[in-house]
Design a protein with these regions (language model features):
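Substrate-binding rim/cap in mid-to-C-terminal beta-strand-loop elements of soluble/periplasmic
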Residues: 53-54, 58, 82-83, 121-204
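Conserved catalytic/binding loops enriched for acidic/polar residues
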Residues: 97
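Short helix/loop capping segments that flank catalytic or ligand/cofactor-binding pockets
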Residues: 25-26, 107-108, 117, 163, ...
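Long, well-ordered, tryptophan-enriched scaffold segments
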Residues: 1-50
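Short, flexible, mixed-charge acidic loops at enzyme active sites
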Residues: 42-54, 112, 166
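A long, amphipathic alpha-helix that forms part
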Residues: 3-9, 14-15, 56-94, 104-106, ...
């Protein structure tokens, strides 16, 4: 992640285009903005990665690496569940729905924050840097990386913009899914989920 949020966001956008994940002729939104405080319209521009100090870049790359590691562990363990269902012959008889409740979290600063320091950003160096991600630590990655995670949209969690509300929903249910491996651009909302599960269970 030392490449920085500008280069990585561009690379993610190119992959989205190559995979044809979006309809029409979408464009990558400009580099994001940083909300001055939660639920307020006042913002300031997100700084370019190359404008940051080396210490800031190293701290921020570590924050994103920690988040990516958590996602990787989650993915591996979801895979373990799926493998067990396959082994028991139950995968095609199991309805799996995987989704997110909102877009990436930009709290509370372009550079993130730590549980120990509250909303204030602190650049970790030396031994502090080595301790990041260990038990007892708590680091948010901030607006810069949230802008990457919401590629190609604008804004973040808390906001009724695409970056806050447009998230993937992955569904698996054997032969009940007609378009296996395909994309469906039909909008859905969390209020749809309960009624869907009730119907599938044959309940009323």
């Amino acid at each position: 992640y030392m490449q920085g949020w500008d280069k990585i966001r561009d690379a993610r956008w190119k992959r989205i285009v190559d995979l044809k994940l979006m309809q029409g002729k979408p464009a990558l939104s400009p580099r994001g903005v940083v909300p001055e405080s939660l639920f307020e319209d006042e913002t300031h521009p997100l700084p370019a990665w190359d404008s940051l100090t080396k210490d800031q870049q190293t701290d921020l790359a570590r924050r994103m690496s920690i988040f990516a590691a958590m996602v990787d562990v989650m993915d591996a363990n979801i895979g373990r569940v799926v493998d067990e269902l396959k082994k028991n012959g139950e995968l095609d008889n199991t309805f799996i729905m995987f989704m997110s409740d909102n877009g990436a979290c930009a709290e509370w600063h372009e550079f993130g924050f730590d549980k120990q320091t509250g909303v204030e950003y602190h650049t970790h160096t030396g031994e502090e840097l080595d301790q990041m991600g260990l038990p007892g630590t708590y680091h948010h990655y901030g607006t810069g990386w949230a802008n990457v995670c919401c590629t190609p949209f604008t804004l973040y969690k808390h906001y009724a913009h695409e970056g806050g509300i447009s998230t993937p929903c992955i569904i698996s249910w054997g032969n009940h899914v007609k378009n296996k491996g395909g994309l469906n651009h039909q909008p859905a909302q969390f209020s749809d989920i309960m009624s869907t599960c009730v119907e599938l269970a044959g309940a009323t």
